[in-house]
Amino acid sequence: MSRLAHNKALPYKIIVDLSFHRTRLPSDVSSLIKFEQRPAIINIHGLLGSHVMFHSLNKLLSRKLDADIFSVDVRNHGISPKAIPYDYTTLTNDLIYFIETHIGLERPIYLLGFSMGGKIALLTTLYKNINIRKCISIDLPPYETPELDPMILQNYDLIMRIIRRDVKILRGSPSWQKKVLELFKSLECNKRKCGGAVALYFANGFLSVKSNNVHQAQLHYEQQQHDPYINYSMPLSSMPNLLDEVKKWPDLSNQRDFFQKGTASRKVLFMKGLQSNFINNDYSLLRYNFPCADVREFNTGHNLLLENPEDSFKCILNFFAEETLDFE
């Protein structure tokens, strides 16, 4: 995809059909029927990510809970369709449509969202007409967050500098992947604990584009592009307000026919990184929409799954396992 393609106006679509990955299913019919009567788990990734971020976690959850797990790509991320708008209400409606289409309204559902995906999960939990039983939001609250983490801002800035060609890396050039990864690793915010994994997370939008491996000289003349530099997987040039949208929490006051305040039957857990500023220390703010919400604290920054994988996995497992056993 050329740079010009990234600058084209995105189509307007009220709903898109999200791409997803599903964990293994039982091979025999009787086991499959029983399997699909138990809660489904849906993972929603964070900003600039994709369903791939949950791959290792899903293997563990699947083994421990024998769970049916769906990992989705949010619109404009991964291989899901590219379209506007990209506000939280639209992203939530995409997920609701996914549930209606691929899982159904009656089946119990557990939601697990990281960062931006946490807000999408929380909004979906407030939707009346689907059977959400549990929701985990990893380090993002159900209200506007005025400031973004420097880690997000610095990595986003580097991505945009490469997209704008302030930093030029030729497609198909020797060791171009290494050059990209080293650029992200050199950011001050990525020199902390687990910084290499964070650098890979943000660099992956370049590394995952197959056409970036093909040098201009290897193309037939009619296929050659005026712009020979690497491209990003997301149409960020067509999403100028992305970071502002990520900060927001929608006004639901005029949508009470569809969204309701949280109830005791829908358990909500917030996993907070104590070194992160996203979730305010006043936890009563969380309980405005989710009166029965619980909070678990971790001595980490925003990326607590990377910084403390053992304790964060135990927290997720225990929260989901508690009721799952009742469906045996």
Curated annotation (Swiss-Prot):
- What InterPro entries does this protein's entry cite? AB_hydrolase_1, AB_hydrolase_fold
**Free-text disruption phenotype from the record:** Reduces ethyl acetate production by at least 50%.
Keyword set includes Hydrolase: yes
UniProt xrefs under PANTHER family:
PROTEIN ABHD11
UniProt keywords, alphabetically: Hydrolase, Mitochondrion, Transferase
Which parts of the sequence belong to the AB hydrolase-1 domain?
39-309
On the tree of life, the source organism's domain of life is: Eukaryota
Q: Which GO terms describe its biological process?
A: lipid metabolic process
Q: What is this protein called?
A: Ethanol acetyltransferase 1
Q: Where in the cell is it found?
A: Mitochondrion
Give an example GO molecular function. Answer: C-acetyltransferase activity
* Cystine crosslinks: none
Q: Which reaction does it catalyse?
A: ethanol + acetyl-CoA = ethyl acetate + CoA; acetyl-CoA + H2O = acetate + CoA + H(+); ethyl acetate + H2O = ethanol + acetate + H(+)
Give the residues annotated as coiled coil: none
Q: State its Enzyme Commission number(s).
A: 2.3.1.268, 3.1.2.1, 3.1.1.-
Which cellular components does GO assign to this protein?
mitochondrion
